[in-house]
């Protein structure tokens, strides 16, 4: 089976999220290829992301000349502003015709790991990872152009993709509720994985703490500064703990500055929370060390389609405090997670104080999670993807 993987929209400047997911899945494909061939379609802009796959057996990195990419994007934006799905569809099909024809000619199936299809008239079976439809649940987190873009591109993708991958049962049911054109048979629930060996291999955390000037014991929240990540409830809970008891629980934040950055960083400064350390984007090896040295991972997100940081923490031997949202509840059937209502600051306060003071519970939870997270491997996920691709081929 020849699989074309459309990686053209992966942003090399973005750390984590879909990039971590794509890298893990590609490594899984490399390990379980079993004769299948993978064509990675990249651009001059992002080809560096796939350097390690250039000389892998069963892989071919195809770099497209994208000198007209910015022009194409501009034309697509104009088409979106027409508010017409039909115009956007025909525009995309025309602009990306050459790319589509190449994939149709060279591959048996086309897989897109980045939320929506680039064009909507592929002659080959298409499989899509839509990841989430957060805009439906939290439209307030999106500008009106972004909401418009998602409405049109996701709607067209829902109608034209042949099969879908969902990272959780919640995501599958969410897609079925909001896209009546999709049937349950078209969606395969394939959990995301974690490269356990990478997160379990010890890192020199002493030099790491020295370089970043962080304390020996801290909470870790590795997430881009987006509104749905819900940084404020964690910061406000920590400030209340300080106000009530004088206890200052150190927190380390990593991730790029996005829609909530000014509010988050402004609050830290205004409240004189010098025990909160914002490191920005950090190299992957440093992130592994931060996980391994953390007392707890804290993930207060309001909405997620998956729980990659939870899996990474489990692999690193770090216990987890996380919001009580459906994907985390699904993971809690296998892992020991300390869940809380992400809208209940007082519940989080109590949980933080209790767990911070009970180191024995943390050790027990970490051992349990590190033992059980091995069932979430990218190799296992890759096998399930290949089974989905074969289903799509049989159904054509």
Residue spans of the language-model regions?
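Carbohydrate transferase catalytic cores enriched for Leloir-type hexosyltransferases
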Residues: 1-396
């Amino acid at each position: 089976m020849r699989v074309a993987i459309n990686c053209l929209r992966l942003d090399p400047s973005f750390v984590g999220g879909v990039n971590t997911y794509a890298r893990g899945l590609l490594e899984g494909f490399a390990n379980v290829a079993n004769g299948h061939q993978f064509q990675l379609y990249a651009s001059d802009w992002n080809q560096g992301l796939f350097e390690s796959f250039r000389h892998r057996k069963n892989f071919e990195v195809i770099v497209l000349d994208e000198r007209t990419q910015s022009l194409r994007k501009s034309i697509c934006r104009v088409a979106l502003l027409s508010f017409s799905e039909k115009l956007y569809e025909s525009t995309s099909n025309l602009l990306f015709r050459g790319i589509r024809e190449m994939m149709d000619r060279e591959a048996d199936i086309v897989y897109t790991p980045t939320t929506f299809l680039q064009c909507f008239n592929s002659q080959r079976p298409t499989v899509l990872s839509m990841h989430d439809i957060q805009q439906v649940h939290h439209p307030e987190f999106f500008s009106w152009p972004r909401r418009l873009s998602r409405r049109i591109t996701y709607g067209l993708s829902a109608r034209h993709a042949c099969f879908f991958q969902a990272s959780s049962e919640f995501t599958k049911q969410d897609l079925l509720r909001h896209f009546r054109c999709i049937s349950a048979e078209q969606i395969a629930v394939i959990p995301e994985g974690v490269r356990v060996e990478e997160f379990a291999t010890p890192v020199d955390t002493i030099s790491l703490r020295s370089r970043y000037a962080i304390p020996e014991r801290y909470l870790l929240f590795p997430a881009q500064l987006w509104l749905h990540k819900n940084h404020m409830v964690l910061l406000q809970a920590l400030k209340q703990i300080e106000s009530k008891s004088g206890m200052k629980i150190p927190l380390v934040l990593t991730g790029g500055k996005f829609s909530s950055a000014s509010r988050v960083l402004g609050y830290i400064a205004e409240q004189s929370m010098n025990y909160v350390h914002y490191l920005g984007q950090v190299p992957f090896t440093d992130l592994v060390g931060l996980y391994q040295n953390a007392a707890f991972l804290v993930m207060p997100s309001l909405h997620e389609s998956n729980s990659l940081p939870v899996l990474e923490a489990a692999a690193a031997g770090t216990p987890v405090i996380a919001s009580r949202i459906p994907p985390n509840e699904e993971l809690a059937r296998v892992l020991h997670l300390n869940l809380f209502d992400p809208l209940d600051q007082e519940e989080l306060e109590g949980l933080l104080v209790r767990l911070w003071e009970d180191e024995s519970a943390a050790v027990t939870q970490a051992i349990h999670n590190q033992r059980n997270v091995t069932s979430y491997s990218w190799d296992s996920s890759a096998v399930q993807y290949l089974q989905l691709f074969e289903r799509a081929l049989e159904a054509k």
